């Protein structure tokens, strides 16, 4: 059977693009990698976007979805960013009835996980 999730395609593109853009922006390895997984759950799907970049400190994980929060306010302007991207991502996911969280290990990478409810299963 096929799994169907009802979502605004443009909004979901923003979510995926923002997360991948952050992964690329903070990649500090020449052999950088981004993996995307879609996990089929009973009544939802879970999407995971994982990189092997510099990671996020545990103390910052609960705050990265806050508007204007930056894990390192002293970053140089070459990395850019205003600190609103992940707050927008969170709002879009929540507006679609889902939720998002991150796991990370400094020096090893970050994984963004988000869950969206299934609409139906088609045979």
Q: At which residue positions do the language-model features occur?
A:
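Conserved micro-motifs of the catalytic ATP-binding
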Residues: 4-7
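Short beta-strand/loop element within the Bergerat-fold HATPase_c
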Residues: 33-43
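Short alpha-helical Gxxx[C/S/T] motif in the catalytic ATP-binding
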Residues: 85, 89
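Acidic ATP/Mg2+-coordinating residue in the GHKL
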Residues: 51
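Short conserved segment of the HATPase_c
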Residues: 56-68
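Conserved glycine-rich
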Residues: 97-98
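Short helix-loop "hinge" at the ATP-lid/N-box region of the Bergerat-fold HATPase_c
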Residues: 23-24
